[in-house]
């Protein structure tokens, strides 16, 4: 069975996907307000609350997350105090074997189940800038998330989006008008031994993708508005978002 998905649909004013929003500990950009407004449930992972607090000065009561989770080594004391006073759920997750992002997803999935929400995707803001080790930790969380939630997860920061394709066939609709010029398929963790695509300028036909051999970066679209990908192992899809 093919999995059909429009990665940039949450950014569209007319988008119909039902999503939850996770704010990580990195600067927020202009897309934040639109995504916040339409989210079914909103959460901050530890220091993500600092960025939310700073960005919404003068209107903070309109931007209260359902919960803030983490080991609370990054959230500033005044930020923690503010959201506590406003009735937000502050959930301590001290486990050092997992990142605050991973632990936030665990809490989020429990909330989704408790509220019996129908969720199409989890949109995450941040996680793709700054320190390289933290970027790779974000990618690792996408792999871990398959054991946490059945809901697909996208990570967005500035002009980049990543989404982990599971083994099988995928139809990615790239006709929203918000797509930038580049895209890529990156075999993180292990080689993908059979990858076939359509809709790209440089397509693959039963090709092996792997570090040390071939990695499909700086690819682009053929103009059809649809990309299909078939892979035998998890494969990271990345794409540009128009500024």
Swiss-Prot record:
Pathway: Cofactor biosynthesis; thiamine diphosphate biosynthesis; thiamine diphosphate from thiamine: step 1/1. It is an enzyme of class 2 (transferase). InterPro entries: Thi_PPkinase, Thiamin_pyrophosphokinase_euk, Thiamin_PyroPKinase_B1-bd, TPK_B1-bd_sf, TPK_catalytic, TPK_catalytic_sf. GO terms for molecular function: ATP binding; identical protein binding; kinase activity; thiamine binding; thiamine diphosphokinase activity; UTP thiamine diphosphokinase activity. Its EC number is 2.7.6.-. Detected in kidney and liver, and at lower levels in heart, brain and testis. The keyword ATP-binding applies. SUPFAM superfamilies: Thiamin pyrophosphokinase, catalytic domain, Thiamin pyrophosphokinase, substrate-binding domain. Disulfide bonds: none annotated. GO terms for biological process: regulation of acetyl-CoA biosynthetic process from pyruvate; thiamine diphosphate biosynthetic process; thiamine metabolic process. One of its GO terms (cellular component) is cytosol. It comes from the Eukaryota. Keywords: ATP-binding, Kinase, Nucleotide-binding, Transferase. It catalyses: thiamine + UTP = thiamine diphosphate + UMP + H(+). Catalyzes the phosphorylation of thiamine to thiamine pyrophosphate (TPP) utilizing UTP and therefore links the biosynthesis of TPP to pyrimidines metabolism. By producing thiamine pyrophosphate, a cofactor of the mitochondrial pyruvate dehydrogenase indirectly regulates pyruvate oxidation and lipogenesis. Although it can also catalyze thiamine phosphorylation using ATP and CTP in vitro, it does so with significantly lower efficiency and without physiological relevance evidence. PANTHER family: THIAMIN PYROPHOSPHOKINASE (PTHR13622), THIAMIN PYROPHOSPHOKINASE 1 (PTHR13622:SF8). Homodimer. Belongs to the thiamine pyrophosphokinase family. This is Thiamine pyrophosphokinase 1. The lineage of its organism: Eukaryota, Metazoa, Chordata, Craniata, Vertebrata. The gene is Tpk1.
